Amino acid sequence: MKLIKSTTIVHSASRNFKEALDLCIESADKADIDIKNVLPVNEKDIDKVIGKKESDLILVIGGDGTMIRTIANLIDNEIPLLGINIGRLGFLTDLNVDSISKVLPEVFSGNYQLEKRPSLSIQVDDSESLIGINEVVFHSGTVAKMLNFSIFQEEKLISKHKSDGVIVSSATGSSGYFFSGGGPIIYPTEEIFAILPMFSQSSSSNPLILPNQKKIKIKLKNSVKASIVVDGREDFEVYQGSEIIISKNKSSYSLIHPPGYDYFEACRTKLSWGQPLINLDD
């Protein structure tokens, strides 16, 4: 792989990031890596402060929330990212504080895996489109209030629902809220939309996986006020007759993984995925 000669560091604005930051700077200095910027994730106009292709790598210090926000803000800058976890689960972050000094020199020397992943574009009626990395959740926002809505692929009706809402996820997001709702895990590079109705008044509202080459449209039928939430951070109200359009975003993003990275190992260790309830080695 390409040698890393320069890096930008983006860190959490709220967590204790200093130890990880110091170790990243120390590793970069030892490898003679040019550090272009060190910025908090909430830096104003961060996509303009960090120039397009300005660095070979962005190191992101934080949890999954910091990682998702950084990806969304910098997706058009075309710089691969590597996450360093100082949060809880850290499914998108491969390193932890203890592994920085050992693994970063390997990455800087070109020993890493590069993985390209698709993202989502979400538009409500004629509003400006939003970028989604994990998922968009369409829900009533009110306990015991159900929504009547229809789901389309382009103009073709897929299904009608009376339920609490629906999750539309990327493959990356399938290991998050979508998985918690009973959806399957999907390999994160797959070009798909994963659709999961929430608490539907139907015995056959199963998850649906569709290619992301065609847009998904959700149309709200009843007068109950509803909301959409994108990646757990963008929250917008929608009303009767509103249409939510989910499409493949024109920009993808790339993650750098350390040598030996295994997605299924991450699923097993971080999600306890596929783990038996009893010891099968006995």
Per-range role (PLM):
Residues 63-66, 89, 172-174:
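Short glycine-rich anion-binding loops that position phosphate/pyrophosphate groups of nucleotides
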Residues 78-80:
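Proline-centered loop/turn at the N-terminus of a beta-strand
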Residues 130, 138, 143, 154-157, ...:
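ATP/nucleoside-binding phosphotransfer catalytic cores, i.e., glycine-rich phosphate-binding loops
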Residues 160-163, 167-204:
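Gly/Ser/Thr-rich active-site loops/lids in small-molecule metabolic enzymes
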